[in-house]
Amino acid sequence: NPALSYLDPSQVGALKVYAGIAPVSVGGDSIGGSIIAETAEPVFAAPGQGSLVRGEAGAFYRSNGNARGANLSATYATESFSISYTGATAQSDNYEAGGNFKERLFGAGNDPAFTGRPGHALSRDEVGSTAYETRNHTLGVAFRGGSHLIEAKLGFQDMPEQLWPNQRMDMLDNVQQRL
């Protein structure tokens, strides 16, 4: 599955795109290009500010595929300490094409929704295996002193399904834990 499909957009601080052959400093072993995704830097209170508290909430809905999701983040920081949480969930059913694009399979007598797999039917404008469901959580802690920064992030991703339309390589019940 495409590597960027694992990312929660609300946790991305910056994206860098290298077209063509990438420099050795960013991997260097790609021919068609590289995309570098970086998480957001920790936030600290300004000198003399005391403590900093901030949060963000968002949601989306797209009618095609009934796609929906939400994200939440919260940060508490002083001049030298920062703790943050980000969480997001997203899911979608199969999406629909702009019109009927599938022909009847295996003869004129078949149900128009027949897919070639017994007991499985899709409408003629439905793009099969495009559904997904994912949940992401990250807890970050950082300490800053002078020009030094110590940062740790704990992450958990639960991806019950990420289907793949052009290959039979659907991902089911994938769980990732990272430090």
Segments predicted by a language model, with ranges:
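Outer-membrane beta-barrel signature, preferentially recognizing the C-terminal barrel domain
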Residues: Y18, M169-L179
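Alpha-helix N-cap/helix-start motif
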Residues: V24-G28, A67, N94-Y95
